Swiss-Prot record:
Segments crossing the lipid bilayer: 18-38, 69-89, 106-126, 127-147
Location of the protein in the cell: Mitochondrion membrane
UniProt name for this protein: Uncharacterized mitochondrial protein AtMg01260
Membrane topology recorded in Swiss-Prot or TrEMBL: Multi-pass membrane protein
GO cellular component labels: mitochondrial membrane
Organism domain of life: Eukaryota
Keyword Transmembrane set for record: yes
Swiss-Prot/TrEMBL keywords: Membrane, Mitochondrion, Transmembrane, Transmembrane helix
Main location: mitochondrion
Annotated coiled-coil segments of the chain: none
Note: A stretch of 270 kb of the mitochondrial genome is duplicated within the centromere of chromosome 2 resulting in the duplication of the gene. The expression of the duplicated gene is not demonstrated.
Length: 205
């Protein structure tokens, strides 16, 4: 097969070489770094639902999303450092930023990530074309299984509800100082009757 000597062909070959030799290793290292550092350091947020959404829900989480984007084709590689910078910009550039700004910023990043998750699913569904089925690779088979399971359980609606609930709490929650972030949360309803029972037992004795 003769190489394409046109300008577009040269640009394609240069971009593919840079992707394989430079951008792909950087994206993998960046994914590992964000997955390690990001999970070990808590986010500057008070909403517990958002932490669960970011750190435990793998289908809708930002940190595994960097790894998912790492195995994309050449078009999606530049999104990884861009999202990493956008996600950590308030903490790196201005650590003393107001909580309201950080909350609205994270809500915007969550909205962007939701669209990219949609692009991710659309991309792997596009690979179902017969042209791509003659060389299925393990990541494709794994993500095909995850997408089919997600569509079967209808998790997209659930994810949208979780996202709307978390964004609503972030946007309309009262803004406090940093000491409120480390303050213990209010006791749940299941704990209150137990404390009342203990008080009554002590008073009777």
């Amino acid at each position: 097969m003769q190489p394409d000597l046109t300008l577009l062909g040269k640009l394609r070959s240069t971009w593919a070489s840079a992707t394989v030799n430079v951008i792909h290793p950087i994206s993998l290292c960046l994914s590992w770094f964000l997955g390690t550092i990001g999970c070990s350091s808590p986010l500057p947020l008070r909403c517990a639902d958002l932490r669960i959404l970011l750190l435990k829900k793998k289908e809708f989480c930002l940190l595994p999303l960097f790894y998912h984007l790492g195995i994309f084709q050449h078009l999606f590689y530049p999104i990884i450092p861009l999202l990493a910078f956008c996600f950590y910009a308030p903490r790196l550039v201005c650590p003393a930023a107001s909580l309201e700004f950080q909350r609205r910023y994270v809500v915007w990043i969550l909205a962007v990530s939701r669209h990219i998750v949609f692009l991710e699913n659309s991309y792997y569904i596009m690979l179902l074309h017969p042209h791509h089925l003659h060389h299925p690779h393990p990541p494709f088979l794994i993500f095909l299984f995850l997408i089919l399971r997600k569509l079967r359980r209808n998790r997209s609606v659930k994810a949208q509800r979780i996202m709307q609930r978390s964004c609503h709490r972030l946007l309309f929650a009262p803004v406090g100082n940093d000491s409120e972030l480390s303050a213990p949360s209010a006791p749940s309803e299941s704990v209150v009757p137990l404390r009342r029972f203990n008080r009554q037992s002590v008073s009777t004795v």
